[in-house]
């Protein structure tokens, strides 16, 4: 400090002498030859720059630097430049030869001495100069001197002649390159002492004396200030600075700012402003300087008013106790001085914006007022962005500020601060009230109205108590605010009042509250529009109700279960009606309802009903057309014993689709999860009775994009509504299976409808697999809705209707005894926790952009494109690519399993496009239990053998592949091969696009058909996992997206372990427990036995079942053969290899951020003996726990 101050002081004093012509004459007097030399050098630089004779790049560089510097200096003193030029022209050589500069300072001497001998050959001098420039050592000291002198000179720059100045100028030419200048300047403050000593040789001796004085003052900037403008202001600053370290830091930027302002006045902005900024030792200072400069520009008058500045400072001093105490509180609070300034600067800008009473505003109230001015309600206003972003992630912060301001006024003894605060706050509160109301945080409004009183009442009250509870923080906050008010305008950084913020701790709760508020706001906006559209569309609510009523009759058959469903069904209808009436509220409700729904089935229906109601609107529209049926919209039935409830789209003529099975199905309303941007309602599993039939209705993502508007297209239905089936199973494990309304066949019209956009489940008929369990998943095309697949009770299989479901994948897992309903919801933000009841997990895969949801028990939610692993028991696994690659797969131990891969792009468990393109609608029902395949587009049906024999149904689905389930796989391949020639595909082995079906590897995928990217697994990045029955038959057919398959000869990106298929980012896992790898952009969550994989992460195989999935191997090769694929076999591509922890399996995933290691802790190599490397861009393989922690950290950072 002292040396820097001294240097600064020296600079200041220099300024006056240099500033006047006296200075010039004086400079010449003591450094006339030096001045001449400097001028000569400048001229040489210009001449060289202009003269082609100096062709060397060094010459050009030197000349250019000199010219640039000279031009930059010009504004200060055009005269000076002209004088330079004139002098140089008159006697360039003498100037060069003159050696007085060396005498003046060793550094200068060193630079200049060579020059004097070289005076003859100017070019040589220039070269030397260039060399010096290149050399950091000598030029830096010179530069150090220069910056100080420059500050001094800047005003004087008008008169460049001073010899010392000239010398520096010489150095400056070389030094001009910013890189040198910056370091040099930074050193100057540090090295002021030695530099000053160097200077001592010449008149600089004065400077040391001044330095001592200023050092006593304790602020370098003060000196600059004094030299430039406001010594008086600086002196108070200095005293303050001396009082508090914070001030010291703040001051230098101020001085620099003042310098810059002076330079601007001088019109020397080009050099001076950069120089002033450059010297700032800390980036913070530079930032502060920029802000201050802006403020000064806006409030130049205020800054220039020394009286006002002094008054403010005086007030601070007068308040003395308050002002100083404010600083003391900072120290007491443990707030670093540096920290305080930053908020101060921001607040200053705010305060500067409101320039009513500088004094009043500057008082702490100003800070409060600035906060208040920024409606810090639900969304922090831009007024204090940085602070609001960090602190007011919770709206409460602004309130705290306000609160602390008013409350502190009583606390703070200083009357001045008090008087100031009430004045500004009252005004601010009035101003802010509307803002806060708009922000939609009533507590905030109340707080602002009566900050002291209401704040305590409102949530801010908590904050206040928390941060006022320490007496020092509260008082300090008040005092600080005062300080901030005064100096902030003056550019005094001393008055930054972070303490209230510091005192207030932002908790996760605050962040959550803020998020919720924002989400609610979004939901209202989004829901109102879609709901309105749906309402308009849903002119035929009765039609929508019929489906429910339909389901209700089904419910009727089961006596006790029926009774349970009946109430729920009524709530559904009622809720649908209500929802139609007021869609917006329902959307907000669904998340809450979904969460609450789990407790009791009746409750669940009611809760679900609101969820469904948004669907109902779209459904109503669809039903009005009667073409689309929201099939099973509300229908999730847990049939006590009955396997699958009849699900029928009421509107659709496809009554056929509904599976009529002993339908004592409780039609539990499927919640339509309304997903507003960030909020996902967790699917509620209602298992009121002992039978744990998890009814997970996953919230559906409310289609934002698709409008429900046209009843004819009825597109909204599929998009908006997904049948999230909640099975409220009153008793037996029997599971309710409901399928969501399916996507209308775009290509092929369903007979019932003419409308192309949506079709209820594509296949006209749902086939019920007699097989003990079948999984049905219906993806919705919109990708907004997730198709919920319900598991039929063990006895009956529910046919699964895949919907096109652009972004959604549904996995249905069924346990023979237990039902699982899986619903996927797409939500951008959070994933709903999935609750699973009983052994059968309900899977909700959510489409989340960001965070993976933690799977409840067995259920895993898919995050962005995260696949769910299904519960261990359920036999059926579906993998869907789901629009962005989220797939949930279920592997079940149930003896009979059906695995239906869903088309990744078009997600279909069962052929989504069953019929379109004349694919035969009838699914080929294998006699084998649970084998139900509906060909879509030419999907080969995978169900070929009884459980043991794995059937590989590979479909060429665009991204879809069917995983064959050994026991029975209905592998509807969408788009692709159909067991039935749909589309003319070969039935058994239909190769779509010429890919051989099943066993033949297509494009290097073994069992899989060519399928564009995937064989059995596929989905664009979805892997269908082959779920194997309880027998551990490795039925998993490996398919490659882009040809990854373990057996596959050629894998585009990776080879999957024979069972595992690497899909784009997905892998299918073979083996009794199949893990599905999905292509999830975000995080893979390792969940219950099935783990979901994040972007490329591979979900681990569940528990002990050996299975390898290598998900996404862009270049991951995981092959038992260990044949290198693209990236090499087990070797990690991109250098990550996941050790195979599990004997049973190694899962490698490509996760961009994290790689998942197999969840199970088996260290052994995979059954095939190869560890699947995961391709992770960023991270080495991490255990799921580590990954979760990582993700948690990331999320926390986001919160901040």
From Swiss-Prot:
Family: Belongs to the POM121 family.
TM annotation in the entry: 57-77
Example of a GO cellular component annotation carried by this entry: endoplasmic reticulum membrane
Composition bias, Basic residues: 1190-1200
Domain notes: Contains F-X-F-G repeats.
Main location: nucleus
InterPro entries reported in the protein's UniProt record: Nucleoporin
Modified residues (Phosphoserine): 83, 244, 319, 322, 325, 345, 355, 367, 370, 408-409, 412-413, 416-417
Composition skew (Polar residues), residue ranges: 379-397, 640-657, 1100-1121
One BP annotation, GO: nucleocytoplasmic transport
The protein's name in its UniProt record: Nuclear envelope pore membrane protein POM 121
Region (Disordered) location: 1-29, 91-167, 177-196, 294-328, 345-509, 530-627, 640-692, 706-744, 1075-1151, 1173-1200
One Pfam family linked to the record: POM121
């Amino acid at each position: 400090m002292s040396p820097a101050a001294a240097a600064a002081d020296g600079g200041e004093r220099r300024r006056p002498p240099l500033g006047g012509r006296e200075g010039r004459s004086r400079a010449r007097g003591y450094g006339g030859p030096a001045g001449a030399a400097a001028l000569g050098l400048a001229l040489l630089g210009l001449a060289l720059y202009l003269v082609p004779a100096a062709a060397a790049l060094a010459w050009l560089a030197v000349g250019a630097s000199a010219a640039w510097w000279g031009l930059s200096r010009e504004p200060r003193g055009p005269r000076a430049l002209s004088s330079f030029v004139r002098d140089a022209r008159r006697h360039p050589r003498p100037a060069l030869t003159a050696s007085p500069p060396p005498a003046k300072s060793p550094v200068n001497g060193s630079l200049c001495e060579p020059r004097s001998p070289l005076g003859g050959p100017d070019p040589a001098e220039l070269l030397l100069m260039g060399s010096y420039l290149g050399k950091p050592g000598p030029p830096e000291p010179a530069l150090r001197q220069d910056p100080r002198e420059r500050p001094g000179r800047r005003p004087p720059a008008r008169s460049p002649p001073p010899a010392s100045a000239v010398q520096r100028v010489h150095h400056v030419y070389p030094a001009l390159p910013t890189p040198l200048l910056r370091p040099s300047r930074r050193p100057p403050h540090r090295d002021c002492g030695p530099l000053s000593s160097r200077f001592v040789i010449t008149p600089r001796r004065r400077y040391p004396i001044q330095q001592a004085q200023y050092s006593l003052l304790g602020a370098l900037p003060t000196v600059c200030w004094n030299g430039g403008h406001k010594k008086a202001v600086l002196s108070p600053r200095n005293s303050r600075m001396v009082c508090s370290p914070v001030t010291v830091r703040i001051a230098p930027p101020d001085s620099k700012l003042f310098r810059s302002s002076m330079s601007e006045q001088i019109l020397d902005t080009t050099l001076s402003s950069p120089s002033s900024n450059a010297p700032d030792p800390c980036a913070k200072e530079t930032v502060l300087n920029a802000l201050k400069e802006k403020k000064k520009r806006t409030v130049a008058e205020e800054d220039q008013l020394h009286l006002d500045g002094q008054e403010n400072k005086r007030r601070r001093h007068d308040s003395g106790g308050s002002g100083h105490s404010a600083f003391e509180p900072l120290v007491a609070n443990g707030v670093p001085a540096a920290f305080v300034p930053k908020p101060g600067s921001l607040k200053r800008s705010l305060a500067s914006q409101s320039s009513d009473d500088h004094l009043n505003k500057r008082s702490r109230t100003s800070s409060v007022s600035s906060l208040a001015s920024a409606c810090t309600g639900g969304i922090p206003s831009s007024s204090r962005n940085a602070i609001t972003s960090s602190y007011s992630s919770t709206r409460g912060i602004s309130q705290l500020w306000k609160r602390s301001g008013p409350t502190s006024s009583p606390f703070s003894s200083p009357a001045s601060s008090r008087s100031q605060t009430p004045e500004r706050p009252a005004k601010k509160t009035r101003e802010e009230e509307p803002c806060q109301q708009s922000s939609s945080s009533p507590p905030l409004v109340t707080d602002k109205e009566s900050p002291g009183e209401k704040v305590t009442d409102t949530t801010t009250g908590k904050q206040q108590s928390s941060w006022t509870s320490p007496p020092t923080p509260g008082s300090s906050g008040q005092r600080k605010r005062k300080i901030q008010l005064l100096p902030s305008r003056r550019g005094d950084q001393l008055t930054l009042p972070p303490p209230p913020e510091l005192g207030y701790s932002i908790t996760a709760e605050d962040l959550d509250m803020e998020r919720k508020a924002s989400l609610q706001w979004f939901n209202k906006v989004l829901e109102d529009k879609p709901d309105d559209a749906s309402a308009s569309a849903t002119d035929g609510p009765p039609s929508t109700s019929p489906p429910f009523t339909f389901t209700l009759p089904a419910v009727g058959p089961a006596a006790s279960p029926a009774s349970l469903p009946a109430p729920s069904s009524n709530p559904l209808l009622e809720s649908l009606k209500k929802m139609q009436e007021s869609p917006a509220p329902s959307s907000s409700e669904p998340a809450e309802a979904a969460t609450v729904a789990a407790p009791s089935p009746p409750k669940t229906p009611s809760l679900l009903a609101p969820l469904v109601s948004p669907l109902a609107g779209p459904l109503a529209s669809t039903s009005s057309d009667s073409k689309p049926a929201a099939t099973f919209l509300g229908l999730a039935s847990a049939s006590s014993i009955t396997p699958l409830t009849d699900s029928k789209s009421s509107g659709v003529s496809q009554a056929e689709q509904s599976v009529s099975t002993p339908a004592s199905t409780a039609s539990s309303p499927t919640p339509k999860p309304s997903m507003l941007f960030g909020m996902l309602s967790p699917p509620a599993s209602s298992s009121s009775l002992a039978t744990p039939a998890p009814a997970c209705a996953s919230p559906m993502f409310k289609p934002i994009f698709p409008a429900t508007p046209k009843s004819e297209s009825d597109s909204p239905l599929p998009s908006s509504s997904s049948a999230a089936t909640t099975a409220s199973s009153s008793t037996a494990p029997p599971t309710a299976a409901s399928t969501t309304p399916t996507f209308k066949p775009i290509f092929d019209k369903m007979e019932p409808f003419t409308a192309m956009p949506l079709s209820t489940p594509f296949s006209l008929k749902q086939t019920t697999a007699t097989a003990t369990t079948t999984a049905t998943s219906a993806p919705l095309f919109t990708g907004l809705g997730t198709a919920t697949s319900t598991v039929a009770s063990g006895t009956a299989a529910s046919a699964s209707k895949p919907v096109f479901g652009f972004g959604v994948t549904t996995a249905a897992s069924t346990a023979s005894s237990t039902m699982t309903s899986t619903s996927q919801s797409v939500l951008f933000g959070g994933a709903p926790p999935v609750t699973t009841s009983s052994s059968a997990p309900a899977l909700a895969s959510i489409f989340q952009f960001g965070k993976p949801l933690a799977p409840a028990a067995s259920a895993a939610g898919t995050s962005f494109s995260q696949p769910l692993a299904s519960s261990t028991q359920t036999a059926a696994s579906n993998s869907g690519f789901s629009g962005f690659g989220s797939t949930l797969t279920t592997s079940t131990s149930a003896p009979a399993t059906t695995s239906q891969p869903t088309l990744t792009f078009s997600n279909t468990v069962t052929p989504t496009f069953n019929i379109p393109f004349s694919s035969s609608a009838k699914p080929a029902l294998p006699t084998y239990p649970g084998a139900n395949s509906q060909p879509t587009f030419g999907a080969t049906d995978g169900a070929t053998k009884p459980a043991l024999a794995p059937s590989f149904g590979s479909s060429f689905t665009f991204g879809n592949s069917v995983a064959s389930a050994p026991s029975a796989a209905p592998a509807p391949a969408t788009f692709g091969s159909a067991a039935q020639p749909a589309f003319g595909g070969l039935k058994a082995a239909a190769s779509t696009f010429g890919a051989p079906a099943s066993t033949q590897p297509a494009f290097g995928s073994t069992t899989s058909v060519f399928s564009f990217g995937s064989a059995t697994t596929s989905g664009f990045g979805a892997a269908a996992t082959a779920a194997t029955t309880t027998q551990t038959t490795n039925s998993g057919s490996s398919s490659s997206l882009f040809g990854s398959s373990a057996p596959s000869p050629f894998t585009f990106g990776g080879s999957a372990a024979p069972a595992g298929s690497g899909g784009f980012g997905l892998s299918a896992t073979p083996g009794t427990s199949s893990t599905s790898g999905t292509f999830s952009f975000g995080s893979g969550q390792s969940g219950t036995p099935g783990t979901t994989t994040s972007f490329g992460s591979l979900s681990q195989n569940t528990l002990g079942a050996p299975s390898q999935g290598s998900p996404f191997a862009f270049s991951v090769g995981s092959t038992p053969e260990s044949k290198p694929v693209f990236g090499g076999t087990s070797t990690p591509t991109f250098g990550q290899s996941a050790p195979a922890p599990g004997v049973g399996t190694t899962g490698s995933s490509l996760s961009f951020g994290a790689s998942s290691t197999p969840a199970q802790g088996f260290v052994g190599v995979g059954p095939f003996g190869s560890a699947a490397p995961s391709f992770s861009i960023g991270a080495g393989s991490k255990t799921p726990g580590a990954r979760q922690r990582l993700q948690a950290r990331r999320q926390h950072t986001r919160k901040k």
